[in-house]
Curated annotation (Swiss-Prot):
Native source species: Cronobacter sakazakii (strain ATCC BAA-894) (Enterobacter sakazakii)
Gene3D superfamilies on file: 1.10.8.60, P-loop containing nucleotide triphosphate hydrolases
Main function: Mediates the interaction of DNA replication initiator protein DnaA with DNA polymerase subunit beta sliding clamp (dnaN). Stimulates hydrolysis of ATP-DnaA to ADP-DnaA, rendering DnaA inactive for reinitiation, a process called regulatory inhibition of DnaA or RIDA.
Subunit structure: The active form seems to be an ADP-bound monomer. Forms the RIDA complex (regulatory inactivation of DnaA) of ATP-DnaA, ADP-Hda and the DNA-loaded beta sliding clamp (dnaN).
Protein name as it appears in the record: DnaA regulatory inactivator Hda
Length: 225
């Protein structure tokens, strides 16, 4: 399956917030282990896809073969896409909650998990929107397997952390986000990070086009607030 991932979603661009243990576990696995399994969960927009993209990017830069399977887009492919993935250095399965109750997909993931265990040479990262035991899977053995490894909740960011995350993204794109503007965005917009990042990108383009710095009046005019 072809792999197209955002080139700006790396560990360097991820604001950790209250998630140092998860970040440390991921980086230890990627940098020092040849195998292992980590499951982490959060609500939608909590940053789990970003971390999977970051993991793929880190190993790809080292020349390792990786696989990323976004199950929210499973209609684009079939369960057989998982065949042979145990030969990769890293397999990332995103949004596993999307296949709960889908027996062919559940069986395909269960079989892949077992093949990865047997190979002993593949790292496996799986994300969901809830803990493994709450996924309402039809296959009890898969639920049991998912509960075996390291399990983390990806903690949501506080408002202060969201401001820091926005300012980090701005710096990585080559501009500054003043604190008052950032707090204005948090006050007036949906606080889900995906929405905030898309809005920040929109403001970046608008400020370049208008050759103006980001100020609250400029943001109000641009966003119609």
């Amino acid at each position: 399956m072809p792999l197209w991932l955002p080139d700006d979603e790396t560990f360097a661009s991820f604001w950790p917030g209250d998630n140092p243990s998860l970040l440390a576990a991921l980086q230890t696995m990627l940098r020092h282990d040849r195998s292992g399994y980590i499951y982490f969960w959060s609500r939608e927009g909590g940053g789990r896809s970003h971390l999977l993209h970051a993991a793929c990017a880190e190993l790809s830069q080292r020349g390792d073969a990786v696989g990323y399977v976004p199950l929210d887009k499973r209609t684009w492919f079939v369960p057989e896409v998982l065949e042979g993935m145990e030969q990769l250095s890293l397999v990332c399965i995103d949004n596993i909650e999307c296949i709960a109750g889908d027996e062919p997909w559940e069986m395909a993931i269960f079989n892949l998990y077992n093949r990865i265990l047997e190979s002993g040479n593949t790292r496996l990262l799986i994300t969901g929107d809830r803990p493994p035991r709450q996924l309402n899977l039809k296959l009890p053995d898969l639920a049991s397997r998912l509960d075996w490894g390291q399990i983390y909740r990806l903690q949501p960011l506080s408002d202060d952390d969201k401001l820091q995350a926005l300012q980090l993204r701005a710096r990585m794109r080559g501009f500054e986000l003043p604190e008052d503007v950032g707090r204005f965005l948090l006050k007036r917009l949906d606080r889900e990070m995906r929405t905030l990042f898309l809005t920040l990108d929109q403001l970046d383009r608008a400020s370049i086009s208008a050759q103006r710095k980001l100020t609250i009046p400029f943001v109000k005019d641009t966003l119609g607030l």
